[in-house]
Structure formats: structure tokens, C-alpha cells
């Protein structure tokens, strides 16, 4: 399946919630009719079956993190192999992706922008350039914006935008040096309450 390159608003409208796919300069509801699905009959949202609810939740989270179906399934398989709550572990794996950590640290305004920054070799992990967006960041790892990228206006804008987001206890960021440390594993209590990971587990468990 190819990566979606169309209007970001359409994805958020499809899921009926803000997927944080845009920079946040303007509230999504200023342009996007969040309560209306895209399409000619979008005003009438069909009542979903249990399977439909599970599928929509999976699609919502997959689109939120910008991950293709096959890769998302692999994260579920890995989470199910580990001890503990499978749903919480799944979100921990997604949050620990390098592109997401770069976004959470405020070095990019969106996850898509963070992915591009990583792919274009603008990010170092523990002093070494890493251009793999899916690379797993571990507790104690130091993520730094490379010198050649620090002057990019989009990064400076992202840092300013990040000041208005809630600080997370599991990362520590120095906005002057554009360097951050992942202090611990992502904390589920600090992640979106709008995600019902149990529905995803039920979908894949069938």
C-alpha cells in the first residue's frame, strides 16, 4: 500500500478527530469540518458494528503515526510477544520510533515533517547519524539535530510551536542546543486519551 499524500484534513475528518497531521498553527476545526466525514454523504455517519469500531480505531492510530498496514501489524505482533499489557506496549513501540521522538521533542511540527528530517540525515542518535524513521529510541539515548540542519526555518518554527504543547516527563529537551534525551519509556498516562488501544488488540486477536 502506498503512503497517503492527499489532504490531511480528509484523514482527520474520516476518523472524526484531530490526528495532529498538521502543524497546529491554526486549529483544525477552522478549516476542517471535523464532525462531518468526507464525501457526498459525509453528514450521515453510518452506525458502526463492533468490527467497524475496531477497524476505525486501528486506522486512526495507524494514520496518526503515519505507518503502513504491514508495518503496523508487525508492531502488534512484537507487542503481543512481550510481557505486560499488549495495548500499552503497542503504543510504547509507536511512541519510541525515532520520527515520533523527534516530533515529541519539538524538532518538527508534525510526524511527517519529523520523518522527512530523519530521512534527510538531519538527526543524530548518540552522536551517530540515523536516517531510519522506524528506529527504536531507548531510555538514555540522546537525539540531536545535526549542525547542517539547525538553521532550517521549519525547525526553528517547530521549536516555537512545541512551547505550547504539554511537556512530557519521559523526555528532556534543550531547545538551545536542539538536543534531547529519552529519560524513560513513554508513559501511557501522558498519551492521548482519545486512543482506545484495546479495540485494536481485539481486532488483531480475531
Curated annotation (Swiss-Prot):
Q: Using the record's annotation, list all stretches that form the S4 RNA-binding domain.
A: 96-158
What CDD domains does the annotation carry? S4
Tell me the domain of life. Bacteria
Q: Where are the transmembrane segments?
A: none
Q: What keywords is this UniProt entry annotated with? A: Ribonucleoprotein, Ribosomal protein, RNA-binding, rRNA-binding
Task: Decide whether keyword Ribosomal protein is in the record.
Answer: yes
Q: Which InterPro entries match?
A: Ribosomal_uS4, Ribosomal_uS4_bac-type, Ribosomal_uS4_CS, Ribosomal_uS4_N, S4_RNA-bd, S4_RNA-bd_sf
**One protein family per Pfam:** Ribosomal_S4
**Biological process GO annotation list?**
ribosomal small subunit biogenesis; translation
GO MF term (any one): structural constituent of ribosome
Q: Name one GO cellular component term.
A: small ribosomal subunit
SMART domains noted in UniProt: Ribosomal_S4, S4
Which protein family is named in the record? Answer: Belongs to the universal ribosomal protein uS4 family.
> What is known about its subunit structure?
Part of the 30S ribosomal subunit. Contacts protein S5. The interaction surface between S4 and S5 is involved in control of translational fidelity.
Purpose: One of the primary rRNA binding proteins, it binds directly to 16S rRNA where it nucleates assembly of the body of the 30S subunit.
- Can you name this protein? Small ribosomal subunit protein uS4
Organism from which the protein derives: Francisella tularensis subsp. tularensis (strain WY96-3418)
Q: Which gene encodes it?
A: rpsD
Amino acid at each position: 500500500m502506498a503512503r497517503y499524500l492527499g489532504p490531511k484534513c480528509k484523514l482527520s475528518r474520516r476518523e472524526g478527530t484531530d490526528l495532529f497531521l498538521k502543524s497546529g498553527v491554526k486549529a483544525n476545526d477552522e478549516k476542517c469540518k471535523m464532525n462531518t466525514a468526507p464525501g457526498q454523504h459525509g453528514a450521515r455517519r453510518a452506525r458502526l458494528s463492533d468490527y467497524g469500531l475496531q477497524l476505525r480505531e486501528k486506522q486512526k492510530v495507524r494514520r496518526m503515526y503515519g505507518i503502513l498496514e504491514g508495518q503496523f501489524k508487525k508492531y502488534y505482533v512484537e507487542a503481543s510477544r512481550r510481557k505486560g499489557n499488549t495495548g500499552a506496549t503497542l503504543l510504547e513501540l509507536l511512541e519510541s520510533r525515532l520520527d515520533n521522538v523527534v516530533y515529541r521533542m519539538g524538532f518538527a511540527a508534525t510526524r511527517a515533517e519529523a520523518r522527512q528530517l530523519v530521512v534527510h540525515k538531519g538527526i543524530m542518535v548518540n552522536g551517530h547519524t540515523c536516517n531510519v524513521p522506524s528506529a527504536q529510541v531507548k531510555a538514555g539515548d540522546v537525539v540531536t539535530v545535526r549542525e547542517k540542519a539547525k538553521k532550517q526555518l521549519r525547525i526553528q518554527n517547530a521549536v516555537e510551536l512545541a512551547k505550547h504543547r504539554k511537556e512530557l516527563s519521559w523526555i528532556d529537551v534543550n531547545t538551545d542546543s536542539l538536543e534531547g534525551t529519552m529519560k524513560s519509556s513513554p508513559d501511557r498516562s501522558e498519551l492521548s486519551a482519545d486512543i482506545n488501544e484495546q479495540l485494536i488488540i481485539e481486532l488483531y486477536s480475531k
